[in-house]
A protein has these predicted regions:
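Alpha-helical transmembrane segments of multi-pass membrane proteins predominantly involved
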Residues: 1-502
Length: 502
């Protein structure tokens, strides 16, 4: 093994770990000297600087062609999504948690950096054991971050997240063990080779089912989503942003790699009139459950955070629609949409955090009169929610159109005939989602307060970091809506280079 080359590939992760250790050291030194914890602002900017430096380090890491057997992968897909994770992580760091609830900001932001390290490592591997270890590094950090607020609700969120996460980790590890037992290979390319030698055994099928269950938890796919509403409502906004944006993007990359590299030969078909056993049918069932449950349950929510949690479940369903088609173009569309979804949800959380600070809660009525007290926040919220709803000309519309059109194309011309039923259900559920997204916008733009009276909330100025967390995603969604090829073409090329050529 060439350790110098390996170290160079791990340079972004090394930068994050070193920054986290420096931050912890500075926090200890400050507390020892002044008997006070390091300030939130100082910890935030140290962490943000580390993420930026990791991005600079990633820029200098070359793409390699040995992703089929290497422990660490730096193919075009890994490089692209490591950059995406760092960008989403930087925006999440910019979201300030409630200061009265975070007693140790040094530890809080260090855990964020450790979580990002785990997500980067997960993005860049095809090795089964290393995949599990990296994913759990990120997960353990997120469990702690979910309970960092000194509130009962945050503690409940952390406990549920940990318990459900522990069960999903057990499923994932057991599934990976069974797949290794079937293939006698520790890499996805080795699994694909074993699968090509004959029909999949019961070990392989059972292992894949358990892996899908484990990854379904990470993606908040129904029926593995029960942790999501409590975590979205109780955890600090920064943690929720990481879970909703960066963690979901990485989970989708892992699922795409697993299905398109390791088990592409066992896809089967989810056709309405010609079902063939395989993971395509599983993806279709999970997609239908996620879309229906996510959208229906979102209609009854009185907390915007919980509404966004069920929105996450529904959007996972849209992503799985594309994977049901098991084509390269559909995989590219899913990866494009998961980025767009992450930006829109992160931005919506940033505005929600500002409303919570000003009004004391995240009820839809707290958004009443937002256009009068904070006009640019209201405009940004309009961009985020209409993008999630799939209204043109924003990036969310382009993403959903790409998802549904590629699934239909595969349905008509590709290897998955008869997916029209699933695309039709997705279109209906997307239309239903308009109601709960627009109900928030109605409060923000039409009503002056909970009872039609002027809002009692007063908008305080946003910090520079918080303003960036609101403004950057909004501008990006508009630009990607007008010029989607800026991101869609690189993703499509990365999918072709990284998955098809294995």
């Amino acid at each position: 093994m060439n350790y110098s080359a390996l170290l160079k590939q791990l340079l972004p992760e090394a930068v994050l770990v070193i920054t986290a250790l420096v931050l912890l050291g500075v926090a200890v030194a400050v507390e020892a000297k002044s008997r006070k914890a390091i300030s939130h602002r100082a910890a935030l900017w140290i962490a943000a600087s580390g993420v930026v430096l990791a991005g600079v380090a990633l820029w200098g890491v070359p793409v390699t062609g040995d992703g089929g057997t290497a422990l660490i992968v730096m193919d075009p897909l890994a490089r692209l999504f490591k950059a995406v994770v760092l960008a989403l992580g930087l925006l999440a760091v910019m979201l300030p948690p409630a200061r009265r609830e975070i007693a140790q900001p040094g530890e809080f932001y260090a855990l964020i950096l450790f979580a990002l390290t785990g997500l980067l490592l997960t993005t860049g591997t095809n090795h089964l054991l290393f995949l599990f270890v990296a994913l759990e590094l990120a997960s353990l950090s997120l469990y702690l971050l979910a309970g960092f607020s000194r509130t009962a609700r945050s503690g409940e969120a952390s406990l549920k997240y940990f318990l459900f996460g522990g069960v999903s980790a057990a499923f994932l590890l057991f599934g990976l063990s069974l797949i290794y037992g079937f293939s006698h290979a520790a890499t996805l390319t080795g699994v694909a080779t074993a699968l090509g030698a004959g029909p999949p055994s019961s070990l392989a099928v059972t292992g894949l089912v358990m892996v899908v269950v484990g990854l379904g938890f990470k993606l908040a796919a129904a029926p593995f989503h029960y942790w999501a509403p409590d975590v979205y409502q109780g955890a600090p906004a920064t943690t929720v942003a990481l879970v909703a944006a960066a963690s979901k993007a990485v989970g989708m990359v892992v699922l795409v790699r697993f299905l398109m590299i390791g088990f592409h030969g066992a896809a089967g078909s989810a056709a309405w009139g010609g079902v063939i056993a395989g993971w395509s049918l599983w993806m279709a069932v999970l997609a239908a459950l996620s879309m229906v449950l996510g959208n229906v349950l979102a209609l009854a929510q009185t907390s915007v955070r919980r509404l966004l949690a069920y929105s996450a479940v529904a959007n996972t369903g849209y992503l799985l629609v594309a994977l049901s088609a098991h084509g390269e173009s559909a995989a590219g569309a899913a990866l494009f949409y998961v980025i767009v979804y992450g930006l829109a949800t992160l931005g919506a959380l940033a505005v929600t955090a500002a409303v919570e600070r000003d009004c004391g809660d995240d009820a839809p009525t707290s958004f009443a009169g937002l256009v009068h007290r904070a006009p640019w926040q209201a405009v940004a919220l309009l961009i985020f929610l209409t993008s999630l709803a799939g209204i043109p000309p924003l990036a969310g519309f382009v993403g959903k159109f790409a998802l549904f059109s590629t699934a239909m194309a595969e349905s008509t011309h590709g290897g998955s005939p008869g997916l029209t039923w699933l695309v039709g259900l997705a279109a209906i559920m997307s239309a239903i989602s308009l109601y709960y997204y627009l109900s928030i916008l109605k409060q923000a733009f039409v009503r002056g307060g909970p009872d039609g009276e002027p809002s009692a909330c007063e908008a305080a100025p946003l910090s520079i970091a918080h303003a960036l967390a609101v403004g950057v995603p909004a501008v990006t969604l508009v630009v990607l809506g007008l010029f989607p090829a800026l991101l869609l073409d690189p993703i499509t090329a990365a999918v072709m280079d990284s998955l098809v050529m294995r």
